[in-house]
């Protein structure tokens, strides 16, 4: 049996001239190289800080300290004959310019909607940062390419800014993105990789490889993407969901999503996709980079099963995928003819606000344009309800169809927790 912790240890601090992209990065790289105008893999966000509690000069200095703290921000892609690789530059962000601009709240709204722009994959930086000053707030708007950043990285980066602002020091990452890339390269040649391949062959044997909502439109009739927000019925509260799934709330929402997809498409099975943060070793807890693993979750629908049986199947597939999630995803998709059409990410209350000292700062992911998946649904836990933020291909789907499917998903969740359907939820 492969000792993955020891394998990671052997690659911490390893010095190379070039580092391979890890398996989470390689598919993103080729998509973006083939679609240079796309922002599908940008991660723009805004964090609002009250002006009366924050000094602008200290804030700018703290951002620079946070940037210097992580290797990922100093990495550059080089396209060699053997394929793309990372090169570590000696860049310092001590003199990095962070533009500051005074704007109205109305202007800020427009800036948020158009902030994401394509990155030059081979340029010096795969991120951009601005500070916008309104009457009440300093708003940090940032956009990081998914090649060097993920959701957990966002939390870590803001933690670093707060620590640098108040203490002048930050926690150093124990494992850098490049350490992990070297480890991932070794993993692909290990027995663990072979075991993961065997696991997925068993899961997908005889399975239908694709679940998709029937399209309303011919693709590209309406270029661009749609976006909507949908609030679940307020009676879907956290305690009811947690009781049904023994606290595994993320698995509950994935399972309900797969069930709704199977019923909506009239099939007896479904494959949907979710993500895992990929930081399965505690030494990665303060690492910034792209570590997320996409996981295909395949379920069969048998009406003779109890809800407990069904959710157990979902959890078995989900956590089996997490265990074997380092498998080369591109090869997995090719072998099993998989297509990422329906994706769901349970975010909980993680991204509603971020702490900045004793300040609870509003945080918001900004809209994108140019997505490749049919549907991407993010589930957020708020004070009174669960909220869905949905991006969809509007060259394929009418908004009415999106709302119909979300309603079917809501009805599934309500049924799972033993509630009847009302009109308390819906699009906002």
What are the language-model segments listed below?
Residues 40-46, 73-79, 117-131, 170-175, ...:
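Flexible, Gly/Pro-enriched loop and linker segments at secondary-structure and domain junctions
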Residues 3, 20, 24, 132-178, ...:
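Active-site-proximal acidic secondary-structure segment that organizes catalysis
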Residues 2-36, 60-106, 125, 159, ...:
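Short amphipathic alpha-helices and their capping loops
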Residues 1-20, 89, 217, 319-321, ...:
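Flexible, non-catalytic linker and terminal segments flanking ANL/adenylate-forming cores
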């Amino acid at each position: 049996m492969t000792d993955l912790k020891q394998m990671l240890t052997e690659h911490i601090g390893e010095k190379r001239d070039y580092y391979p992209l890890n398996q989470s990065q390689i598919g993103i790289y080729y998509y973006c190289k083939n679609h240079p105008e796309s922002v599908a893999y940008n991660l723009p966000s805004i964090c609002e800080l009250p002006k009366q509690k924050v000094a602008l000069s200290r804030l700018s200095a703290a951002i620079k300290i946070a940037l210097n703290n992580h290797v990922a921000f100093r990495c550059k892609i080089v396209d060699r004959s053997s394929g793309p690789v990372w090169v570590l530059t000696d860049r310092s962000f001590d003199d990095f310019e962070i533009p500051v601009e005074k704007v109205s709240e109305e202007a800020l709204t427009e800036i948020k909607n158009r902030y994401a722009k394509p990155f030059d994959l081979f340029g010096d930086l795969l991120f951009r940062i601005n500070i916008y000053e309104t009457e009440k707030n300093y708003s940090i708007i940032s956009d990081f390419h998914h090649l060097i950043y993920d959701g957990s990285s966002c939390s870590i980066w803001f933690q670093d800014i707060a620590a640098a602002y108040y203490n002048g020091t930050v926690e150093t990452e124990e494992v850098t993105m490049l350490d992990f890339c070297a480890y991932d390269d070794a993993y692909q040649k290990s027995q663990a990789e072979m075991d993961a391949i065997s696991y997925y062959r068993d899961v997908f044997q005889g399975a239908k490889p694709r679940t998709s909502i029937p399209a309303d439109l011919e693709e590209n009739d309406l270029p661009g993407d749609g976006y909507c927000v949908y609030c679940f019925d307020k009676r879907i509260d956290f305690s009811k969901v947690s009781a049904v799934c023994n606290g595994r709330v993320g698995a509950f929402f994935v399972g309900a999503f797969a069930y709704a997809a199977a019923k909506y498409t009239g099939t007896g099975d479904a494959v949907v996709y979710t993500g895992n943060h990929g930081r399965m070793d505690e030494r990665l807890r303060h690492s910034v980079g792209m570590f997320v693993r996409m996981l295909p979750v395949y379920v069969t629908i048998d009406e003779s099963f109890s809800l407990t049986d069904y959710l157990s199947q979902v959890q078995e597939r989900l956590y089996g995928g997490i265990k074997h999630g380092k498998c080369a995803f591109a090869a997995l998709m090719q072998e099993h003819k998989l297509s990422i059409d329906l994706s769901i990410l349970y975010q909980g209350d993680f991204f509603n606000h971020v702490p900045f000292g004793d300040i609870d700062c509003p945080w918001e992911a900004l809209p994108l344009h140019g997505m490749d998946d049919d549907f991407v649904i993010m589930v957020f836990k708020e004070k009174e309800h669960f909220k869905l933020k949905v991006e969809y291909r509007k060259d394929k789907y009418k908004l009415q169809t999106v709302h119909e499917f979300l309603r079917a998903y809501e009805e599934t969740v309500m049924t799972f927790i033993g509630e009847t359907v009302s009109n308390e939820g819906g699009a906002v």
